[in-house]
């Protein structure tokens, strides 16, 4: 059906001038009028037209735009250009080179030209040169996002929305939009608008003077008078859940211009609205590959998406009601239990994973970097849901990568040198650890990795960087990610007759870099096995966790709360410094006396500091409190106890009351009063992993034996 494009342009003008929405006070808010005024005064560059707004006025025009987007982009741009003088109230203060150039040319033209003379079509100013704004369309909400493999020939020239993962991002480079030439004979200027990625420069001057005199003037490109725009190429790949059986994921090239550049990084899940266009091959490739043409998506709008849902990544702040719901009583336990609620038990492991997601605070004193990210290793028997926990964290973390030990090489984890298909230069392609920058990298089957590949992780886990010296490229890449590793013991199952080192068989240099190392054992216990079996059968039948008084939090809400927590930068007050140093010295002393199998070093103290700041972040506080330090020490002790759970019969037969007694006895000063403060004794025992109830029971038991006395106010324990 033929369309009158002049009438369509008038419709566009009317829409831009007259469209309004009522605000909360009932006043008319002219959405596009305000933006046009900003563009006229150079306060805004991009004008994004929401097709949902246009659908309220003219649904037919929306259909036409979706079918023939390139033509209507130019129509809308012409309409905006004609409307701008009406909205311009003052002169632009800061003028760039192109402004001055165009002003000079217009003044010269008005002086030297007869008013009745027609303008030569070859050297009249193209509209692209005069436009100082960019125009984009936002797809209507009724249009559904497509998979990469569903965008086919019927979508050519149409506005489509595609979802995928960004795999490659080129550098932003200037792309020529209008080429300006000067003739060496007559001095006339010629303009060449460029629509495609490649163009053939003009050589001979087309002006009337050169053609009349047959002087054969040659044209020279003037870069200062030409117009350039920012250009970037992305490669997106479809999601693994969208790939049919037996196929490999498809890729698509996306050309991004102007204000849409630098919005995505490799590894981001994005939704891109754009025009699907063909591009004929050029040069040598055209000769070799004949009539084949490539396709690409010319981007109009790029937004980051959530991984698991089809909605955009939530960046809005949490409301007061949502904050109140999260930060109610026992919110720490509630948040931890909301991590993988289908998995039974593992309360302390889930707390550690919650702190890993939140992370500690980075410090950079005088160029030396102290990491804030928390690294956790889950070691355990087969079938204790290690991989399930990893995959849940991969889904929950706003930015993450999931790899397995055997499927990852050292290059795949760090970086590879590749040849850029666009420019032909040697470039670096980031691996899993680089793609997980500012996020979490989950590595399953950590024990199956080759030793040569595993050494690539050492630098990342402490310095948070990757140093590369390959193919003449010397650089350092950022890899500020937390590492969550899952591994099986050396003999498949944990062998209690062997030492911890023989069971784990990972180098001490690597183990000391993990803040928490959990050993999850599958021990037979009738009551526990019964509850676990009931839980598993219920989940299998109903595909959800069993009903309980506790209601797990929504994944989207948790993701937004974790992002909010990361904005806090809590500090450790001076009042806690002595307490921390005393606690660390005590841990070193215990490691010496107990012949501890785990390695207690200065990194252990840094781990406690990281866990403490993560707990303070979780409470949205700016200062670390004593309870945070105690909880961090408790988690550290529990992770060590998990490693020593089967260390001979002595540790199994020792009752909690006996351990509490020996702990309190060690606190008694050698000289002076043989008494201990009740609160300090309780804190010491709780930090070692005992509950307040066990502490009370031990006090009563030894009080009946007349070993010590507790005063009535319960503030002091005195040895008899």
From Swiss-Prot:
Top enzyme category: hydrolase
InterPro entries: AAA+_ATPase, MCM, MCM7, MCM_CS, MCM_dom, MCM_lid, MCM_N, MCM_OB
Main subcellular localisation: nucleus
Post-translational modification remark: Ubiquitinated by traip when forks converge following formation of DNA interstrand cross-links. Short ubiquitin chains on mcm7 promote recruitment of DNA glycosylase neil3. If the interstrand cross-link cannot be cleaved by neil3, the ubiquitin chains continue to grow on mcm7, promoting the unloading of the CMG helicase complex by the vcp/p97 ATPase.
Record's miscellaneous remark: Early fractionation of eukaryotic MCM proteins yielded a variety of dimeric, trimeric and tetrameric complexes with unclear biological significance. Specifically a MCM467 subcomplex is shown to have in vitro helicase activity which is inhibited by the MCM2 subunit. The MCM2-7 hexamer is the proposed physiological active complex.
Family: Belongs to the MCM family.
Protein known as: DNA replication licensing factor mcm7-B
């Amino acid at each position: 059906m033929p369309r009158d494009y002049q009438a369509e342009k008038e419709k566009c003008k009317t829409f831009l001038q007259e469209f309004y929405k009522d605000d909360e006070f009932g006043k008319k808010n002219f959405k596009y009028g305000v933006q046009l005024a900003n563009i006229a005064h150079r306060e805004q560059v991009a004008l994004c037209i929401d097709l949902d707004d246009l659908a309220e006025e003219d649904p037919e025009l929306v259909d036409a735009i979706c079918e023939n987007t390139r033509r209507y982009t130019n129509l809308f741009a012409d309409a905006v250009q004609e409307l701008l003088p009406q909205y311009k109230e003052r002169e632009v203060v800061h003028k760039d080179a192109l402004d001055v150039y165009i002003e000079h040319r217009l003044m010269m033209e008005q002086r030297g030209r007869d008013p009745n003379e027609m303008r030569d079509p070859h050297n009249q100013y193209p509209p692209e040169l005069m436009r100082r704004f960019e125009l984009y369309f936002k797809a209507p909400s009724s249009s559904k996002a497509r998979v990469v493999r569903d965008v086919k020939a019927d979508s050519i020239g149409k506005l489509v929305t595609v979802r995928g993962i960004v795999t490659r991002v080129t550098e932003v480079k200037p792309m020529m939009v209008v080429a300006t030439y000067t003739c060496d004979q007559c001095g006339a200027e010629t303009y060449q608008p460029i629509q495609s990625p490649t163009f053939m420069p003009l050589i001979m001057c087309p002006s009337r003077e050169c053609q009349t005199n047959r002087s054969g003037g040659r044209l020279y490109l003037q870069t200062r008078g030409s117009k350039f725009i920012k250009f970037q190429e992305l490669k997106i790949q479809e999601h693994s859940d969208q790939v049919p059986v037996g196929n490999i994921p498809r890729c698509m090239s996306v050309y991004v211009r102007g204000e849409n550049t630098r919005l995505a990084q490799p590894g981001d899940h994005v939704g891109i609205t754009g025009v699907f266009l063909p591009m004929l091959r050029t040069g040598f490739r055209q000769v070799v590959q004949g009539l084949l043409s490539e396709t690409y998506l010319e981007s109009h709008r790029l937004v980051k998406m959530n991984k698991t849902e089809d909605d955009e990544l939530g960046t809005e702040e949490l409301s007061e009601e949502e904050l109140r719901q999260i930060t109610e009583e026992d919110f720490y336990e509630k948040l931890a239990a909301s991590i993988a609620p289908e998995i039974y038990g593992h309360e302390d492991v889930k707390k550690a994973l919650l702190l890993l997601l939140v992370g500690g605070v980075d410090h950079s004193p005088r160029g030396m970097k102290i990491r804030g990210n928390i690294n956790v290793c889950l070691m355990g028997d087969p079938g204790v849901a290690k991989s399930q926990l990893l995959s849940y964290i991969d889904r929950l973390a706003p930015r993450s990568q999931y790899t397995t030990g055997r499927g990852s090489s050292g290059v795949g984890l760090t970086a590879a040198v590749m040849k850029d298909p666009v420019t032909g230069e040697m470039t670096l392609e980031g691996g899993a650890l680089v793609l997980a920058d500012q996020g979490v990298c989950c590595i399953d089957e950590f024990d199956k990795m080759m030793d040569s590949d595993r050494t690539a992780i050492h630098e990342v886990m402490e310095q948070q960087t990757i140093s590369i010296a390959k193919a003449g490229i010397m650089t350092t890449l950022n890899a500020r990610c937390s590492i969550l590793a899952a591994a099986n013991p050396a003999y498949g199952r944990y062998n209690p007759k062997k030492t911890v080192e023989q069971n784990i068989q990972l180098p001490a240099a690597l183990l000391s870099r993990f803040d928490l190392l959990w050993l999850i054992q599958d021990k037979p216990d009738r009551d526990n096995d019964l509850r676990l079996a009931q839980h598993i059968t219920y989940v299998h039948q109903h595909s959800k966790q069993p009903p309980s008084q506790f209601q797990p939090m929504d994944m989207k809400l948790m993701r937004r709360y974790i992002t909010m927590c990361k904005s806090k930068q809590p500090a450790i007050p001076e009042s806690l410094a002595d307490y921390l140093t005393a606690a660390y010295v005590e841990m070193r002393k215990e490691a010496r006396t107990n012949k501890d199998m785990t390695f207690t070093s200065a990194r252990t103290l840094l781990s406690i500091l990281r866990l403490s700041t993560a707990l303070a972040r979780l409470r949205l506080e700016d200062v670390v409190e004593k309870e945070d330090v105690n909880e961090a020490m408790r988690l550290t002790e529990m992770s060590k106890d998990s490693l020593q759970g089967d260390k001979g019969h002595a540790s199994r037969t020792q009752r909690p009351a006996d351990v509490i007694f020996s702990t309190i006895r060690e606190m008694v000063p050698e000289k002076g009063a043989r008494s201990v403060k009740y609160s300090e004794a309780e804190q010491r025992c709780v930090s070692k992993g005992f509950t307040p109830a066990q502490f009370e029971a031990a006090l009563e038991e030894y009080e009946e034996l007349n070993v010590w006395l507790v005063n009535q106010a319960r503030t002091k324990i005195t040895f008899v």
